[in-house]
Structure formats: C-alpha cells, structure tokens
UniProtKB/Swiss-Prot annotation:
The keyword tRNA-binding applies. Keywords: Nucleotidyltransferase, RNA-binding, rRNA processing, Transferase, tRNA processing, tRNA-binding. Disulfide bonds: none annotated. Homohexameric ring arranged as a trimer of dimers. This is Ribonuclease PH. InterPro entries: ExoRNase_PH_dom1 (IPR001247), ExoRNase_PH_dom2 (IPR015847), ExoRNase_PH_dom2_sf (IPR036345), PNPase/RNase_PH_dom_sf (IPR027408), Ribosomal_Su5_D2-typ_SF (IPR020568), RNase_PH (IPR050080), RNase_PH_bac-type (IPR002381), RNase_PH_CS (IPR018336). Gene3D superfamilies: GHMP Kinase, N-terminal domain. The gene is rph. It comes from Escherichia coli O6:K15:H31 (strain 536 / UPEC). The keyword Nucleotidyltransferase applies. HAMAP family: RNase_PH. Phosphate binds at residues 86, 124-126.
Length: 238
C-alpha cells in the first residue's frame, strides 16, 4: 500500500496557484502533495553575450531550497559561499526543459529567468519546479504580448515532469520522500504535452532495472504527465 492509499499510476494532488507574488511577470505556487515550490518568471531585455545579434531569446533557471524545507535544517548555499553540484544539475535541467516549450527565435532578444524556491520538500522537487515554472513562463510570455513587446506568443506548448521508480519491486508514479528514499530505481521524466520526451534521468539505486521495466516506467510517466498537463491548462484557463 502506497502512502495515502494511492494506486501505482496515480500522481499526488497537484495545485497551481497563479499570480502568487505581485512583482514577477509570472509567479506560481506549485504543490505536489506536501511538496511546495514557488516559481517566478522574470523578463529582462537583452540576451547573454554568446547570443548577441542572433535575434533569439534565452531561458535560464535558478533553483534553491529554503533551510527548513527539509526534515532538518540545511544551511543556505549563499552562506556556504558556493552552489552544490545537485543544485547546479537541477537548475540546468529546469532551464533545458523550459527552453523546449518556447520558440526562442520568436521570443526575440529577451531573457527569461525562472527562479524555483522549494518551500517544503517531500520528494519530486525538481519535477514540481518544472511543472510550476512552465505555467509561470506562460504568464510571463503572455505579458510580453499584452505589453506590445511581442506580436505573437512564442509558447509552443506545455512541458511537465514527474518522478517514477521501482519501490518494493513495483513500478510507481510520483514518489513521495519515503518512497524515494527506499526506491530500487529512481527516474525523473520530462515531456511535452503531446508525450515527446525532453529528458530522462534514471538511476538504479539498488538492483539494476531491465529494458522492460524502463518501458513500464516511461509509460507510467507519460500517463502521469498527461494528467499534470490537464491541471496546467486548467490553471491557465482560470
């Protein structure tokens, strides 16, 4: 039996609260069960030096966890004087995922930064960050259109992510912390709204997994992401 009696293919309740803060062009509080992440999208005119003069935009991301988002307090990385490898890996993943959602040529020479701050962690913080940041990004892009900075919205479609894994020999979708810490296999999957894969991060924590198990996990992820995209679109229609 999974926590909260979920079936193996069931994601936790997902909530997306838009316009959560007043200053950012896009802001969303995303909740996957007890995992809560604040995602903001900030627009700046201009692009990084390596893109200057190419007539295209850029999307980047930063990720961080509040000191008491976890069971015991973790010192802020700013206080340590450097970012950890996990943080850098996750923010690069978020940025790659969100760049797949946008026509960067149509964006023009704007940079959009997605800041994902974990308020409470109970597994799946990176997948929640991608899911919430995509909605914040959609709001920011719409503001560019409304303000006359862009003629058309460069958003190609929604992008969402979910974790899957093998726990006690069973393939499950959207792992909570207690499942994640006991998983034999742990995988994060990012997809477009039509089911095309952007990224798969998979690791055998204990027992190596088979090709058949990989296909099962990808199918589980696709089903979970389809339901998450429905929630994203409903939030944006509100």
């Amino acid at each position: 039996m999974r926590p909260a009696g979920r079936s193996n293919n069931q994601v936790r309740p997902v909530t997306l609260t838009r316009n959560y803060t007043k200053h950012a062009e896009g802001s969303v509080l995303v909740e996957f069960g007890d995992t809560k992440v604040l995602c903001t999208a900030s627009i700046e005119e201009g692009v990084p030096r390596f893109l200057k003069g190419q007539g295209q935009g850029w999307i980047t991301a930063e990720y961080g966890m509040l000191p008491r988002s976890t069971h015991t307090r973790n010192a802020r990385e700013a206080a340590k004087g450097k970012q950890g490898g996990r943080t850098m890996e996750i923010q690069r993943l978020i940025a790659r995922a969100l760049r797949a959602a946008v026509d960067l040529k149509a964006l023009g020479e704007f940079t959009i930064t997605l800041d994902c701050d974990v308020l409470q962690a109970d597994g799946g913080t990176r997948t929640a960050s991608i899911t919430g940041a995509c909605v914040a990004l959609a709001d920011a892009l719409q503001k560019l259109v409304e303000n006359g900075k862009l003629k058309t919205n460069p958003m190609k479609g929604m992008v969402a992510a979910v974790s899957v894994g093998i726990v006690n020999g069973e393939a499950v979708c959207d792992l909570e912390y207690v499942e994640d810490s006991a998983a034999e296999t742990d995988m994060n999957v990012v997809m477009t709204e039509d089911g095309r894969i952007i990224e798969v991060q998979g690791t055998a924590e204990g027992e190596p997994f088979t090709h058949e198990e990989l296909l099962t996990l990808l199918a589980l992820a696709r089903g979970g992401i389809e339901s998450i995209v429905v929630t994203q679109k409903a939030a944006l229609a509100n």
